[in-house]
Amino acid sequence: MNLNSTPKICFIIGMMPRTGTNWAYDILMQSNHTGNIGPIWEDNLLNHVETLESAAKKIASSWDSKWKADHQKIEVLRLTESLQKNFELGLEKFVHQQFLTSSCEADNPTYLILKSPNAWHIKPPKTLLQRNKCIILTRNPHDLIASGMASFGWGLFGACNRYIESTKAIVQLNDSCNQCLTISFEDLKENLCESVQQLYNYLDISLPSFDFSSLAVRGKSPTKKNEKMTWTAQGITSKEQIQKHKTSKIFMSKIQHMVVSELCITAGKSLGYSFGAQKTPNVVRWGIRAAFRLFCFVRKLKG
């Protein structure tokens, strides 16, 4: 397959659910230059590079020391890089083949848009993003975790741990592939027009004549028996809604906000978010840290 003559791929990766993955996807799908591949195949596709590393390490670690093959262990790990490049090429071909058999409305799109609300375990690609594009969506930890707890029933410590690990993956991805575009949920909500223009400029495609404030945004909530919900962008981007949100502490208690502040402040700052002075008493902070370490230890034991 000649990759130069096929559409490029734009991966939309939300650091976690509730970061606006569907929103950004729907914004870009209003263009005649974008297409999809039918089913949402991309969800977790980029996460499987870790499987290659695990397989290589598992093979090498099983070798008996009597074989004196330590130097071969290094070669096996180097082989992983070659496997990863081939894996990425195969993934790219897979996406294009799915496009050829799907009911994409655009006959010859410039980009195929794929989305995934899951940055955890993503490894920086070796060559995939040299030919394609990647949009990363972030959100401040308080609102993201509160929204996830309300919509998906997340546990507080588990959500904080996932936020921290997803942030590490995003920072590593950005450091390795500086051609990625990062947009926050707050940007979409508070500066919709500018954010839409930024998305289209990034893909170098023309902005369609469309009222993006009236765009229907889709989602669903497992805590409501997977009930599908639709709302318009205007419903969350109006000045009244933004001010209402800023003056209310949604979904979480004061102590829960303390936990998020204590555990996720470093991760949030690395994504560009700013926080007020920490007012939590030291004894409470130590207790939160100790409980979180115990949670992570027990979780690791359970595998």
Stretches with model-predicted labels:
Residues 83-95, 117-118, 158-166, 191, ...:
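Soluble or luminal CAZymes and related metallo-dependent hydrolases
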